[in-house]
Amino acid sequence: MDLKYLNQKEAIDVDQELFTEYKFSVDQLMELAGLSCAHAVAKCFPAEKHPRILVCCGPGNNGGDGLVAARHLSLMGYTPTIYYPKPTAKPLFENLSHQCQMMDICGVKECPSVATAASDYDLILDALFGFSFKPPVRADFVAVVELLQQTKLPIASVDIPSGWDVEKGKLTECDVEPALLISLTAPKLCARHFRGEHHYLGGRFVPPALQRKYGLNLPTYPGNELCVKL
């Protein structure tokens, strides 16, 4: 059987079933997802060559994955800087932000220009929007999406390249073109349109019964790895 690519409804259903049927908590899955993202980044963009990472976080769970990834990347020898234009006023996200602050991870208030990003960073982690995204991009995020579209820096996108349709992929030719896509739990249909160099699967937490129910046919994670190349 081939690896299954999920449509938007299937992605939402799988997520909800992890919470309701399998009793995972949001922070539990977010920690595992963000950690797997950090490991995928480290495999593709070693800290020796790409130490400075701009981590762009959105308002939902995708942004939470980015905050977790930033914390772990800081422990792996990277220097992450967080751009979080619309922080989520929920204890989970406030705690994740606080953890980053306590680990001396800096943040920026304004979205860097293309030129500033080119001089100050080596890589951008795109953790803006996940599989629940529906266009258009809200005003708070227009500047950072334009940065992602225009930058020459390599981009690592968490689950969905920001601005893409979860099923159809790019909506315009100028949409984000990440070098690394980290699909979480299972790849979404838009990943079929990914043309970048690196595609990894992260989120090593899917119960076998859930895999069978949805026919996910996920690849085997090698050894003790937290992500697997697709």
UniProtKB/Swiss-Prot annotation:
Gene Ontology annotations for the cellular component aspect, listed alphabetically = mitochondrion
Q: Where does (6S)-NADPHX bind?
A: N61, N62, G63, G64, D65, G130, F131, S132, F133, K134, P135, P136, D159
Residue ranges of every copy of the YjeF N-terminal domain listed in the record: 11-218
| Catalysed transformations (reactions) | (6R)-NADHX = (6S)-NADHX; (6R)-NADPHX = (6S)-NADPHX
User: Which classification does the entry list for the species?
Assistant: Eukaryota, Metazoa, Ecdysozoa, Arthropoda, Hexapoda
**UniProt-listed NCBIfam families:** yjeF_nterm
Which cofactor is essential here?
Answer: K(+)
What the entry lists under InterPro entries is as follows: YjeF_N_dom, YjeF_N_dom_sf, YJEFN_prot_NAXE-like
Q: Which UniProt keywords apply?
A: Isomerase, Metal-binding, NAD, NADP, Nucleotide-binding, Potassium
EC number(s) stated in the UniProt entry for this protein: 5.1.99.6
**Listed PROSITE patterns:** YJEF_N
Q: Which organism is it from?
A: Drosophila yakuba (Fruit fly)
Q: Which GO terms describe its molecular function?
A: metal ion binding; NAD(P)HX epimerase activity; nucleotide binding
Q: Which family does it belong to?
A: Belongs to the NnrE/AIBP family.
Name of this chain's protein: NAD(P)H-hydrate epimerase
Q: How is the cofactor bound?
A: Binds 1 potassium ion per subunit.
Q: What does this protein do?
A: Catalyzes the epimerization of the S- and R-forms of NAD(P)HX, a damaged form of NAD(P)H that is a result of enzymatic or heat-dependent hydration. This is a prerequisite for the S-specific NAD(P)H-hydrate dehydratase to allow the repair of both epimers of NAD(P)HX.
Q: Does Electron transport count among this protein's keywords?
A: no
Annotated residues that bind K(+) are located at N62, D126, S162
